[in-house]
């Protein structure tokens, strides 16, 4: 407002925008007084403004004024344009840093919070100084303490608070005489000589040397006082920035480690990257958490749309309320007479652009000291896993500290739950004394509400209760059960009170049940059965077949169709194999930063092999006898997850006999009987349509096959079994069977709608089907999944 220049307050995406911290908020009235109102009359702070507005002006000049109209932003020709551009420098740009310094000073005098153009941390005796923007500085400050305490390193940190105008004098004074500086930036401009911050710092230091040699307006710096500049890229697109990255950067400057390509500081290479699998990457072998002593670190695993992030925020708020209780129980005061905090919280979510239906995480730390680390937590004490299928796509046990706790969504028995843990992880559980708890969160939520959307969201509240059951938080802070319930209920009143007492009560009940029903399981054997896939094996055909990738069989052979021979060979970048080798090869967060990632190209068909099984709680089941083939469900499905087909009766019967009968001799016998089975089946189908009895096709076939001679009961069972797994409609699909059969007897067919593994269980198809009742949402089970997969494979 003083400079009359546009201003931007830049934040780190997903961290400073989404993180939750314990902090003191300045009073609203104080901020209003400090900032002033737009209509306040102030002294014009510069000669230029005095020339334009007079000795006094509005704090925010009113240029859109009908009483005093002016033309804003006219087109400028060449004889005028440059005048305006260069005159902004001395009239409006150059005074800005002075205004900022005055504002920092005034704010510090009023609040005790002192900032400046740059903020330094332990740089006085430092030989090496990190230079950063944004929340990375707090991570680095914790690492600075670690390096000083454990290695005796003379290292410090500088945070640049103002990037435009660039505070060259402040930077020169802060970095003069250092041996090394490590400039870390959330960008990588490969076509530029340096990334922006490093470029500005290099320019400022060069000007300082020039001032030493030739005089100038900036503070002088001797050539021997100019530090060596190391430059690193990190955190782009919210990429995780971890302690081992900070330590690796320092080790690189000291020649203790090299880049992945083998080059190091002794080779004159001063550029590196952090946090990705790249030839220029550096990383330390040391992986400390850098969390305060006695901290409790929590990691949530869930699915986007299930309310886990809301649960995490509620947990953070509740712990914050406990902090007030603890501080008042044994009060102490700071130099200003304010009650000192004795409990600190830091929390942040992690999710991608797809969020809903995709895996999500939430991280929370509670500690008796301020928490400066804001990365993903790889050292945790409690894992709250709201996702019952977590082991099918991740490892929720990863990073659990010895003696840590995993609370896992499961309505299974303890013995079955142990078998849900992959065998490869069970020894880790035993070796590290990991405590495994199960909690039927969805069942608790279903008992609390009949609304499915609320069941998903309220499930998380049960895990909130489970946290207080399994963690040491209540005992560590001497909080009894009455205090616990009182604080939680007050938070629920604050969060849900506007929806009515019933909502508060139901959420409180879910939380309480989560606390009470959390059950610890005893270890089984490492060699016990492994049912961690959460799937049953489908009924597979004999021999080798090309299987639709959307079938969800999760077995070898599920590949996309081969291109025709006459089609030219694809370049690697166009193939699914190349894409899968980097992005779906079990590498998780450690995919290579290579040529393919640089292009930003995906081969066609990647979605066909993507499973939504992880997120599905309910699946539509096709009721063939009710289907009218209106196709509303097909067009409504947002995921093209309802493939459909019409087939001849003979094709269905022959395919079943040819591919699902194990006895070769009886297979031949059955194939010979197919024409007669088809004939009799068709007769009964016509009778059923005329009688409107809607007799299932599978029942018709089963009765006919049971009467065959020279075929064993086992073969009859195999044949009837596969037919029973198929969604085959004829009764009400007029265009496929009834009309065709009437016009051309013997030619009516069967219609099928399959549910593929692309289905996320949104229920849109059931909604549009309506009263036809040909699709019904059904709880997803391993048995149902196997049946749907069997049908698709067929």
Residues covered by each model-derived region:
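Ferredoxin-type iron-sulfur electron-transfer modules and their immediate structural context
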Residues: 500-753, 758-759, 766-794
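Short, hinge-like loop/turn segments at secondary-structure boundaries
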Residues: 25-28, 362-366, 793
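Active-site cofactor/cluster-binding pocket
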Residues: 165-169, 180, 184-186, 290-575, ...
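Flexible, low-complexity linker and terminal segments
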Residues: 3-185, 190-285, 300-303, 308, ...
């Amino acid at each position: 407002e003083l400079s009359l220049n546009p201003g931007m307050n830049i934040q780190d995406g997903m961290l400073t925008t989404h993180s939750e911290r314990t902090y003191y908020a300045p009073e609203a009235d104080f901020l209003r007084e400090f900032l002033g109102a737009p209509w306040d009359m102030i002294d014009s702070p510069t000669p230029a403004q005095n020339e334009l507005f007079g000795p006094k002006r509005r704090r925010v000049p009113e240029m859109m004024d009908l009483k005093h109209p002016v033309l804003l932003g006219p087109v400028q020709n060449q004889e005028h344009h440059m005048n305006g551009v260069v005159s902004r420098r001395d009239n409006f740009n150059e005074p800005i840093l002075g205004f900022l310094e005055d504002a920092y000073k005034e704010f510090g005098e009023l609040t005790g919070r002192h900032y400046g153009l740059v903020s330094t941390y332990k740089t006085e005796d430092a030989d090496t100084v990190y230079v950063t923007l944004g929340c990375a500085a707090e991570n680095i400050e914790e690492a600075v303490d670690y390096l000083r305490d454990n290695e005796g390193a003379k290292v410090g940190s500088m945070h640049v608070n103002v990037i435009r105008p660039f505070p060259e004098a402040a930077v020169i004074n802060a970095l003069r005489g250092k041996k090394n500086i490590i400039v870390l930036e959330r960008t990588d401009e490969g076509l530029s000589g340096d990334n922006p911050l490093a470029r500005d710092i290099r320019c400022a230091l060069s000007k300082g040397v020039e001032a030493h040699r030739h005089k100038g307006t900036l503070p002088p710096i001797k050539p021997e006082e100019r530090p060596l500049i190391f430059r690193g890229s990190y955190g782009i697109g919210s990429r995780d920035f971890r302690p081992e990255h900070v330590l690796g950067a320092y080790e690189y400057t000291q020649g203790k480690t090299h880049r992945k390509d083998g080059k190091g500081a002794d080779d004159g290479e001063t550029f590196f990257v952090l946090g990705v699998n790249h030839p220029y990457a550096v990383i330390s072998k040391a992986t400390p958490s850098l969390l305060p002593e006695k901290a409790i670190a929590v990691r949530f695993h869930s699915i986007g749309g299930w309310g886990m992030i809301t649960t995490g925020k509620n947990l953070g708020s509740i712990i914050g309320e406990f902090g007030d209780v603890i501080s008042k129980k044994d009060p102490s005061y700071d130099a200003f007479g304010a009650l000192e905090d004795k409990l600190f919280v830091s929390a942040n979510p992690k999710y991608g652009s797809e969020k809903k239906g995709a895996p999500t995480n939430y991280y929370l730390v509670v500690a008796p000291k301020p928490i400066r680390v804001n990365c993903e937590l790889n050292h945790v004490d409690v894992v709250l896993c709201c996702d019952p299928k977590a082991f099918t796509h991740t490892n929720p046990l990863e990073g659990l500290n010895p003696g840590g706790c995993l609370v896992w969504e499961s309505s299974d028995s303890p013995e079955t739950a142990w078998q849900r843990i992959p065998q490869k992880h069970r020894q880790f559980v035993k070796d590290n004394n990991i405590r495994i708890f199960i909690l039927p969160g969805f069942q608790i939520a279903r008992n609390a509400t009949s609304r499915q959307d609320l069941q998903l969201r309220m499930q998380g509240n049960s895990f909130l209760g489970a946290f207080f059951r399994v963690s040491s938080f209540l005992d560590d802070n001497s909080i009894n059960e009455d205090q616990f319930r009182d604080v939680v209920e007050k938070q629920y009143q604050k969060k849900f009170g506007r929806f009515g007492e019933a909502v508060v009560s139901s959420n409180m009940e879910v939380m309480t049940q989560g606390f009470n029903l959390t059950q610890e399981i005893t270890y089984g054997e490492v060699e016990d059965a492994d049912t961690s896939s959460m799937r049953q094996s489908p009924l597979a055909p004999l021999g080798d077949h090309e299987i639709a990738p959307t079938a969800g069989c999760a077995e070898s052979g599920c590949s996309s169709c081969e291109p025709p021979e006459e089609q030219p060979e694809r370049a690697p970048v166009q193939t699914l194999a190349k894409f899968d080798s980097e992005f779906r090869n079990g590498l998780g967060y450690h995919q290579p930063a290579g040529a393919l990632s640089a292009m930003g190209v995906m081969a066609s068909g990647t979605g066909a092999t993507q499973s939504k099984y992880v997120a599905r709680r309910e699946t539509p089941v096709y009721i063939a006898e009710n289907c009218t083939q209106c196709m509303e469900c097909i067009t409504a499905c947002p995921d093209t997850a309802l493939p459909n087909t019409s087939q001849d009766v003979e094709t269905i019967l022959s395919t079943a006999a040819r591919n699902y009968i194990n006895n070769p001799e009886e297979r031949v016998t059955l194939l010979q009987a197919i024409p007669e089975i088809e004939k009799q089946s068709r007769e009964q189908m016509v009778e059923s349509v005329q009688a409107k009895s809607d007799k299932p096709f599978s029942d018709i076939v089963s009765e006919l096959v049971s009467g065959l001679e020279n075929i064993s009961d086992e073969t009859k069972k195999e044949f009837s079994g596969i037919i029973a797994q198929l969604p085959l409609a004829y009764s009400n699909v007029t265009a496929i069977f009834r009309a065709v059969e009437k016009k051309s007897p013997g030619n009516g067919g069967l219609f099928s709608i399959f549910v593929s593994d692309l289905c996320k269980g949104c229920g849109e198809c059931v909604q549009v089907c309506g009263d036809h009742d040909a699709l019904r949402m059904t709880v997803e089970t391993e048995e149902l999944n196997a049946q749907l997969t069997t049908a698709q494979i067929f």
